[in-house]
Amino acid sequence: MFGKAGIAGLMKQAQQMQENMKKAQEELAKVEVEGQSGAGMVKVTMTCSHDVKRVAIDDSVLEDAKEDKEMLEDLIAAAFNDAVRKVEATTQERMSGFTNGLNLPAGMKFPF
């Protein structure tokens, strides 16, 4: 089916793709996205490797939090979830070149 030259070529392509993927993942780890909730009153800054860098809470929310702790918790969770969705979208967009031609099932996230 494949001669030695064909297999060697496939192996070289696979190795090159692996190196390119590693570089792309290293670059993505430096990219930051910001998730928000409450019209920007709570912000979560996260890298595309899911490391949270900052959480910013508007002073007005803190004043209300004394009376409504659950509201503050909900705002933080919503901002965090917004950041995660942005990380996934950014990662998918930047990694799409690697998935072309791989025939991955619909909904499969990459990198795995």
Swiss-Prot record:
Transmembrane segments: none
The keyword Transcription is annotated on this UniProt entry: no
Keywords, alphabetical: Cytoplasm, DNA-binding
Pfam family, one: YbaB_DNA_bd
Primary residence: cytoplasm
Gene3D superfamilies noted in UniProt: Nucleoid-associated protein YbaB-like domain
InterPro entries hit by this protein: YbaB-like_sf (IPR036894), YbaB/EbfC (IPR004401)
GO cellular component: bacterial nucleoid; cytosol
Gene Ontology MF terms: DNA binding
Subcellular location field: Cytoplasm, Nucleoid
Keyword DNA-binding set for record: yes
PANTHER family reported for this sequence: NUCLEOID-ASSOCIATED PROTEIN YBAB
Quaternary structure and interacting proteins, as annotated: Homodimer.
UniProt similarity note: Belongs to the YbaB/EbfC family.
Classification via NCBIfam families: DNA_YbaB_EbfC
Function: Binds to DNA and alters its conformation. May be involved in regulation of gene expression, nucleoid organization and DNA protection.
Protein known as: Nucleoid-associated protein CV_1611
Source organism phylogeny: Bacteria, Pseudomonadati, Pseudomonadota, Betaproteobacteria, Neisseriales
